[in-house]
A protein has these predicted regions:
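Acidic/polar low-complexity surface segments
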Residues: 109-136, 153-173, 230-257, 284-286, ...
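Glycan-recognition and processing domains
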Residues: 450-512, 518-527, 572-614
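Right-handed parallel beta-helix
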Residues: 150-254
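Residues in short coils/turns that link rungs of repeat/solenoid architectures in beta-rich domains
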Residues: 111-112, 158, 163, 191-192, ...
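Detector for repetitive beta-architecture
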Residues: 48, 80-82, 87-89, 95, ...
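Short, T/G/N/S-enriched strand-turn elements that build extracellular solenoid repeat scaffolds
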Residues: 72-76, 91-100, 114-117, 140-143, ...
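Extracellular beta-strand-rich solenoid/capping regions of secreted or surface-exposed proteins
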Residues: 69-78, 90-105, 111-152, 157-182, ...
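Acidic Gly/Asp/Thr-rich repetitive segments characteristic of extracellular carbohydrate-active
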Residues: 51-86
Length: 614
C-alpha cells in the first residue's frame, strides 16, 4: 500500500521499505532507490530471441520449421517480444504460427526485392516456403495467430516455383490472419507467392512497405469492420523475366488480381502500385458484403482492368490521384469498369490520369451507381480506332466536371438508360465531343467548343489536316498520326485508314459541298468498291490504280448540321507486301487532308484543327 506523509517542508511516499522524499520548501527533490522501485512496480521486460539459438540454420537445406516455432512460442510464453531472423536462407518445410504480441523480425527495414543483376542471389533474411504445393486450400504458410502479431523485415520465396508452369501451381496464402485485431505485415517481399496476403475478420490491420509479384492474388480483405490500412505496397514482376507475350506473364495479366477488397469498412489505401495483372484493384461482394473506403495515390500499369467495381457500399469508393494504364499490347483494356452487378454506392475520381493502350477509360454499366470524374486527365483511349468514347455511360448517374481530354475522337457517350448526366467545364482538343442518347436527361454546360460549331462562315469552307493536332473531333476509326513519307508532303502528317474510316463533319443545311481528299492509295488497296460514302450513296470514287494526290467528290445538300461520311478502302498488311516490315496492321490509304467547300463560299478557308482563318 502506498501512503503519503506531509510536513512543513517535505512529503514522503512510502511503499513497504521504499521511500521517496520530496523537498518542497527548498525546491529540491531527492529520489532514492529509483531502479529498485521501477523493478518492483513496472512490467517485466519483453523477450527477445534469435532463431539460431533454437537451432535454426540459414543454409537453405535444413528444415527450420521446429526451431522457428519453438522460438515464437517461447517469446509468447514470456508475454510477447521479438524473434529475430538473421541473414540467411531458412528452409521451412511446414507452417508457422506467430502468436499474439510477437514479432517475427528479419534484417530488412525497407521492402526488399530480388537482385535483378544476379537473380539467384537473395541477401538478407529469406524464408524458403515448401508447404501446400498444388492446392489453394489448407493452412497458410504463416498465420498471424493472435492480435498484434507482426511479420516484418523478411523475404519469402517458393523454390519450387517455375515460370514455365502455366497455369501456375497453386498454394495456400503465404500469410493469413483471421479473427484478430491490430496485426501487421511490414517491410516484406513476397517474391513468387500464389496468393500473398489474406485478411479475414481482422480489424485495424496494417500492411506497409510490401513488395512482390504474387501470381493469383496479392491482397484479399474481407469481413474487416474497423479501418484496415494498406500503405506503400508495390506488386511488380520481381523475380520474373517479364515479357507481355510470355505465357506465364500473360496468364497473370489476364487472371491475376493485385488487390481485392470485399467487405471492409473505412478502408484506407495509400501509395500503392501494381503492374501486369488482369485486375489491379477489384471491389467484390462476399457473404459479408462489399467495400467503402479512401484510395489515395494508387496506380495500375499494364492491367486489363485497372479498377473493377463489382459492388460497393453506399458511402462509396473515393479514388484520388490515381494513375491508370491499359495492358501492354491489348485492345480491350478498360481502366475503370463499374459492373452491372454493382447494387449501390458512388465511385468518385478526383485528379486522376489515364493513358496507354486503352479501349475505354471509364465504363459505367450499373443502373444503381453514381459516378463522378473531377479534375481528371484522359490522355489516350480507343486503341482500336473504332470510335469508342473515353467515358461510356450506359446507365446510372454521372457528373463529369473540369476534366481534360487528349488523343481520341469521342469523349463521352451518354446511353439512353442513363438517368442523369451533368457534363460541365470540360476541355478537349478540337472541342468537347458528346454522343448524347439520353435527350434532356443530359446537361452540357460551359464545355470547350469548336469554331465550326459556332461560325457559319467557317463552316462554309474549311480544311482538316489529318494527323495534325486536334483532328480527332472529325476523324474516327483510323490509325494514330504519323509522319508523311511522300515527296512534297514530307512535312505533313497522315493517318492510315481502316476499312471504314469515318469523317464527322459540320455542314450548312441545304448547301451542296465540293469535297477534296488528299491521299496516297497504294496498289494493294485498290478496289472497285473504294470510295467516300454518305450512307449507301457514294459521293466520291477513288482511282482504279495506285494514286498520290487529290480526289474530288460532291456532297448533296443535307437537312442536318452534321454528316458522317464513310471512307471505304480495301485493307492490306505491310508485312505481306514487305517481308522485312514489322507492321502487322491491316491498313487502307494514307490520308493527308480533307477540304469542304459549300457552293457559293468565298476563297477564305478556315483551318478546322486550329479554328484560324487562312
Amino acid at each position: 500500500m502506498l501512503t503519503w506523509k506531509a510536513g512543513k517542508s517535505a512529503r514522503t511516499a512510502q511503499n513497504g521499505k521504499l521511500q521517496f522524499r520530496f523537498l518542497g520548501s527548498s525546491g529540491m527533490r531527492t529520489l532514492h532507490w529509483i531502479a529498485l522501485f521501477l523493478l518492483a512496480v513496472g512490467p517485466a521486460a519483453a523477450a527477445d530471441l534469435d532463431v539460431t539459438s533454437m537451432g535454426a540454420v540459414g543454409d537453405g537445406k535444413t528444415d527450420c520449421t521446429a526451431a522457428f516455432q519453438k522460438a515464437l512460442d517461447a517469446v509468447a510464453a514470456k508475454g510477447g517480444g521479438i524473434v529475430n531472423v538473421p541473414a540467411g536462407h531458412f528452409r521451412i518445410d511446414g507452417r508457422l504460427k506467430i502468436p499474439g504480441a510477437v514479432t517475427l523480425q528479419g534484417t530488412f527495414r525497407t521492402p526488399p526485392t530480388d537482385q535483378r543483376e544476379d537473380r539467384p542471389k537473395l541477401d538478407g533474411s529469406v524464408l524458403l516456403a515448401f508447404a501446400g504445393r498444388g492446392s489453394r486450400d489448407g493452412e497458410p504458410f504463416i498465420r498471424l495467430a493472435g492480435s498484434t502479431a507482426t511479420l516484418a523485415g523478411l523475404m519469402i520465396a517458393y523454390p519450387e516455383w517455375k515460370q514455365t508452369d502455366v497455369p501456375p501451381v497453386p498454394y495456400p496464402p503465404t500469410v493469413l490472419t483471421q479473427d484478430t485485431v491490430n496485426t501487421a505485415i511490414l517491410d516484406c517481399c513476397f517474391l513468387n507467392s500464389y496468393e500473398a496476403i489474406r485478411y479475414q475478420s481482422a480489424a485495424r490491420f496494417l500492411v506497409r512497405n510490401v513488395h512482390g509479384y504474387p501470381t493469383f492474388r496479392g491482397l484479399y480483405v474481407d469481413a474487416c469492420y474497423d479501418i484496415g490500412r494498406v500503405e506503400n505496397v508495390h506488386f511488380w514482376p520481381f523475380g520474373v523475366t517479364y515479357k507481355p507475350d510470355d505465357p506465364f506473364c500473360k496468364w497473370v495479366n489476364v487472371n491475376g488480381v493485385a488487390f481485392e477488397f470485399a467487405r471492409t469498412d473505412w478502408q484506407y489505401v495509400v501509395n500503392t502500385f501494381c503492374f501486369g495483372y488482369g485486375v489491379g484493384y477489384k471491389f467484390s461482394r462476399s457473404q459479408a458484403g462489399s467495400c467503402n473506403g479512401n484510395f489515395l495515390g494508387i496506380g495500375a500499369d499494364s492491367c486489363r482492368r485497372a479498377v473493377l467495381v463489382e459492388d460497393s457500399q453506399y458511402p462509396g469508393l473515393l479514388i484520388t490521384n490515381g494513375e491508370f494504364v491499359g495492358r501492354w499490347g491489348s485492345d480491350d483494356s478498360v481502366c475503370l469498369e463499374v459492373a452491372e452487378s454493382a447494387s449501390e454506392g458512388k465511385v468518385s475520381l478526383n485528379n486522376c490520369s489515364f493513358w496507354g493502350p486503352i479501349d475505354r477509360c471509364v465504363w459505367l454499366r450499373s443502373p444503381a451507381v453514381q459516378f463522378t470524374a473531377i479534375g481528371t486527365h484522359f490522355r489516350e483511349w480507343d486503341v482500336n480506332r473504332r470510335g469508342i468514347p473515353a467515358i461510356q455511360l450506359d446507365a446510372g448517374k454521372a457528373i463529369v466536371q473540369g476534366n481534360t481530354f487528349g488523343r481520341g475522337d469521342l469523349h463521352v457517350l451518354v446511353g439512353p438508360k442513363v438517368r442523369s448526366a451533368i457534363l460541365m467545364a470540360n476541355q478537349a482538343a478540337g472541342g468537347f465531343n458528346v454522343d448524347n442518347q439520353a435527350a434532356g436527361r443530359t446537361q452540357l454546360v460551359a464545355n470547350e467548343q469548336n469554331i465550326l460549331d459556332t461560325s457559319e462562315t467557317a463552316k462554309s469552307h474549311y480544311r482538316l489536316d489529318i494527323g495534325a493536332p486536334d483532328d480527332n473531333r472529325y476523324v474516327r476509326k483510323c490509325f494514330a498520326p504519323e509522319s508523311c513519307q511522300y515527296g512534297e508532303r514530307s512535312d505533313k502528317t497522315i493517318r492510315w485508314s481502316t476499312s471504314q474510316t469515318e469523317f464527322h463533319l459540320p455542314v450548312l443545311r441545304g448547301k451542296p459541298y465540293t469535297v477534296n481528299l488528299d491521299l496516297n492509295l497504294p496498289q494493294a488497296a485498290v478496289d472497285p468498291a473504294n470510295g467516300l460514302y454518305l450512307g449507301d450513296q457514294r459521293v466520291m470514287e477513288l482511282p482504279a490504280k495506285a494514286y498520290l494526290g487529290t480526289v474530288t467528290g460532291r456532297l448533296p445538300a443535307c437537312d442536318k448540321d452534321h454528316v458522317i461520311l464513310t471512307l471505304k478502302v480495301k485493307t492490306w498488311c505491310p508485312k505481306d507486301a514487305d517481308p522485312n516490315s514489322k507492321d502487322m496492321r491491316r491498313i487502307g490509304a494514307a490520308l493527308c487532308s480533307l477540304t469542304m467547300k459549300a457552293d457559293g463560299a468565298g476563297d477564305g478557308v478556315t483551318n478546322a484543327n486550329t479554328g484560324d482563318a487562312e
